[in-house]
Swiss-Prot record:
Gene3D superfamilies, per database record: P-loop containing nucleotide triphosphate hydrolases (3.40.50.300)
Subunit comment: Associates in the nucleolus with the 60S and pre-60S ribosomal subunits.
Catalytic activity of the protein: ATP + H2O = ADP + phosphate + H(+)
Composition-biased stretches (Acidic residues): 43-54, 77-88
Region (Disordered), start-end ranges: 1-91, 556-578
Helicase C-terminal domain span: 343-497
Keywords (A to Z) from UniProt: ATP-binding, Helicase, Hydrolase, Nucleotide-binding, Nucleus, Ribosome biogenesis, RNA-binding, rRNA processing
Ranges of compositional bias, category Basic and acidic residues: 13-26
SMART domains (UniProt xref): DEXDc, DUF4217, HELICc
Protein name per its UniProtKB record: ATP-dependent RNA helicase has-1
Binding residues for ATP: A151, K152, T153, G154, S155, G156, K157, T158
Positions of short motif DEAD box: 260-263
Source organism: Neurospora crassa (strain ATCC 24698 / 74-OR23-1A / CBS 708.71 / DSM 1257 / FGSC 987)
Amino acid sequence: MASEFSKKRKLKDAKIATEDGAATDKKTKKVKKDKKEKKAAEEVVEDATPEEENDAQKAEEQQDGDEVIPTGNGDKEDSDDKDAEAGDELTKTNDSLIAPSIATNATDFSELNLSDKTMKAIAEMGFTKMTEIQRRGIPPLLAGKDVLGAAKTGSGKTLAFLIPAIEMLSSLRFKPRNGTGAIVVTPTRELALQIFGVARELMKNHSQTYGVVIGGANRRAEAEKLGKGVNLLIATPGRLLDHLQNTPFVFKNMRSLIIDEADRILEIGFEDEMRQIIKILPKEDRQTMLFSATQTTKVEDLARISLRPGPLYVNVDEEKQFSTVEGLDQGYVVVDADKRFLLLFSFLKKMQKKKVIVFFSSCNSVKYYSELLQYIDLQVLDLHGKQKQQKRTNTFFEFCNAKQGTLICTDVAARGLDIPAVDWIVQFDPPDDPRDYIHRVGRTARGNNTKGRSLLFLQPNELGFLAHLKAAKVPVVEYDFPKSKILNVQSQLEKLIGQNYYLNQSAKDGYRSYLHAYASHSLRSVFDIHKLDLVKVAKSFGFSTPPRVDITLASSMSRDKKQTSRRAYGSQPKQNRH
């Protein structure tokens, strides 16, 4: 397709998940890259819910067979009697990495007494001033304290936890043979890849190794990398637990555990996995950093079992007037169901020179509207959980690198991802609750002194959601779109769907999934499926009359039941155990 998103572009960043990422110094020989790491990821049907990810991993393990996995004692050039001594030194080193004289009111990175290698990388990334979470979080973390951080997405917390972890690895002179010294646990694969990319930039001048293990990627290649020694490891919970239990690699020297987006990790059902991970990992001399946008009971429980007594609590949001970031203009538009797509189409036509993200409630809706928009010559990228992992990775980095264009997606992209210079966030389908709204709009106006705009589509029967936003301290104003500016292509749309078999089938799937998602909404007092005008809803999918869907079945399905019922492609149902 002819657009800014050139398919011929070589997306170097998209391959980061399959590269070892080790920057070696002059005294260390380079480790050869395993060709298997370049294979495309296994197909995964939905986002990484615990049951699905575990099933997928079991299927991959069966395919791996009885392969001999290397031990985690590392490089051949270091195969001398100093290996054991190095391990002892690591366990005896003082936790404090900075001198007590560092000013706690530092505002510039240059005031932190960081290593020259880290400072050079930070300068090359274009950072000089610290954000509030960095200013308040990095000094105590460098001093070895446990930190419980509360900060909005886009606040700069990735650097806040990576810099202390990298400085620790550098200070202790970690080598591959010393194994894993720091682990970052994050809820989604895309966020793990993004953190990996930031780590790669920060560690370009260091000799320590780094890597990522995520569901949907080649497990065998990951195991081989871990066996060689990965000093900084970024991981999703299910895959990390799998490797901790089944892959021989060195993690006895681990000094730093970082749990990012803890509330989201728990929301999608990884509570049991996190408890097991924390139980397996070494506790002695371990520093833990836990970051969460919201402080729920489950997050407090996780903090209690993972953090040492008396952690430092850093909340950069408690004094803020609003829950969303500054520099973000937020609005909503009231539109009947049958005019929703017409308004979206008109809006995207006008915004083709801007960078726009549009959120939908289901994978099938994303798939259908992506196919439809491209069929009528409005080029978009799409990102959802039914895509292969490699496709999701490529799409994410392609949109990151683009200066303009439209990405339509599900909430797989709504949390934590740092997509540069997004002008508009459009919530075509309503979020599940105000927290999801905040995470979605967090894709724009990220960092200091940045601007962005958001638009929420609401039907007349959904205006009760505004009260929930107000209670969550989210300021929104009503936007008015003149009817004369809305392109009326309804008759052409219905004709197209009636004549094109494949679009027709895709439209039916999208319509069905939209209703099922709507029926499983957590705010059912506001988003009541029985108040929907199905004729008008069907028109937004290009139907003159509604396709048949079992609404009773849909409304009986809860979001949790739907998530836990999903299985990975090719996996088998779990058998009863006696």
